[in-house]
UniProtKB/Swiss-Prot annotation:
Positions that bind ATP: 147-199
Primary gene name: ddl
Provenance organism: Rickettsia felis (strain ATCC VR-1525 / URRWXCal2)
Taxonomy, superkingdom: Bacteria
A GO biological-process term: peptidoglycan biosynthetic process
Residues at which Mg(2+) 1 binds: 268, 282
Domain ATP-grasp: 121-315
Function of the protein: Cell wall formation.
EC number: 6.3.2.4
GO molecular function: ATP binding; D-alanine-D-alanine ligase activity; metal ion binding
UniProt entry keywords in alphabetical sequence: ATP-binding, Cell shape, Cell wall biogenesis/degradation, Cytoplasm, Ligase, Magnesium, Manganese, Metal-binding, Nucleotide-binding, Peptidoglycan synthesis
Pfam families referenced in this protein's UniProt entry, alphabetically: Dala_Dala_lig_C, Dala_Dala_lig_N
Family designation: Belongs to the D-alanine--D-alanine ligase family.
Pathway: Cell wall biogenesis; peptidoglycan biosynthesis
Protein name according to UniProt: D-alanine--D-alanine ligase
Length: 321
């Protein structure tokens, strides 16, 4: 089995991390998605912060019986530390809405929209947010040659952490006829824009700041580069002219608000080299909380340490009526 694919797990694993506290928080992480390992790493720091803040904490590595486990432990709040399928796509928020358990991060529609690249793109364009040109290619199209002019980007519709993303450059020995659609029957083929990778942390509707990612290895910001120390350098704050930096923050807040996000989010952009034009890539409603993650780094720059960041996220916990 490809470790970067969703796999079905019947039973959740439950571990009590702290037996007393002001409120009982279920920290749901791991799960069945391709981003399972990232979620588990994120949960390590989150669990320590929750205990430090004085909460009773139960860790749940989510399986298909998650509803049964939640009924058994009866938490006051669920901290949704999942990434990818079943957690980031709106499934867990939907369940928690039915169970009327307050939870962190965005709700059903916001999560589902942000997770699906076709629908989020339509939403962005409807709200006059600039994006790169793209087309949708179906496996059944049986395309035998490059669907667009090189260079271009192949993106699975519903994967995060750049899993399955490929950039096809002019000189690459790549035949589209051999592409096997490993993450579903559709992909987005997007115009490759050469430029500076910029990321913005947003918390409760307010942009905390922006950083630039400078690649030290690899040709683009892929899974390996994101989660391997020494593969990329983070320039925080992003070294931009004041007017451009402010525009970046305003655009991020606009995306957050139009998508009706909740709690933390991370907006991603490319600043085209030749024109200084901003192109939105996506908004991530379940940003990582690992030692190399961007939202905690920007929050620290804004004067919010990791423990206080987790406390601010907890304050936003709610369910949708």
């Amino acid at each position: 089995m490809n470790k970067y694919q969703t796999h079905w797990v019947e039973h959740s694993e439950v571990k009590i991390l702290s037996t007393t506290g002001k409120k009982h928080i279920a920290l749901v992480a791991g799960g069945m998605s391709a981003e399972r390992e990232v979620s588990l790493v994120s949960s390590e720091g989150v669990s320590k912060a929750l205990i430090e803040l004085g909460y009773k904490v139960t860790f749940i590595d989510m399986g298909a019986d998650i509803a049964v486990k939640l009924q058994e432990i009866k938490p006051d709040i669920v901290f949704n530390c999942l990434h990818g399928t079943y957690g980031e796509d709106g499934c867990l928020p939907g369940l928690l809405n039915i169970m009327r358990i307050p939870y962190t991060h965005s709700g059903v529609l916001s999560s589902a929209l942000a997770f699906d690249k076709i629908h989020s793109r339509s939403w962005f364009l409807t709200n006059n947010i600039n994006m790169a040109e793209s087309i949708i290619v179906n496996k059944s199209d049986n395309i035998k040659s490059d669907p667009v002019k090189r260079p271009y980007v192949i993106k699975p519709l519903t994967q995060g952490s750049s899993i399955g993303v490929e950039v096809i450059f002019e000189e690459d020995d790549f035949n589209f006829a051999d592409y096997n659609f490993p993450y579903g029957y559709q992909v987005i083929i997007e115009q490759y824009i050469k430029g500076r990778e910029l990321q913005v942390a947003v918390l409760n509707g307010k942009a905390l700041g922006a950083l630039e990612i400078k690649l030290l290895k690899n040709r683009f910001y892929d899974y390996e580069t994101k989660y391997t120390e020494g593969f990329a350098e983070h320039l925080c704050p992003a070294p931009l002219p004041t007017n451009l930096y402010e525009k970046l923050l305003v655009e991020s807040e606009k995306i957050y608000k139009t998508m009706n996000c909740k709690g933390p989010a991370r907006a991603e952009f490319i600043l085209e080299e030749q024109t200084n034009k901003l192109y939105a890539l996506e908004i991530n409603t379940h940003p990582g909380m690992t030692p190399l993650s961007i939202v905690p780094e920007i929050a620290a720059y804004a004067g919010i340490n990791f423990t206080n960041l987790i406390e601010e996220i907890i304050k936003t916990a709610s369910f949708e009526s």
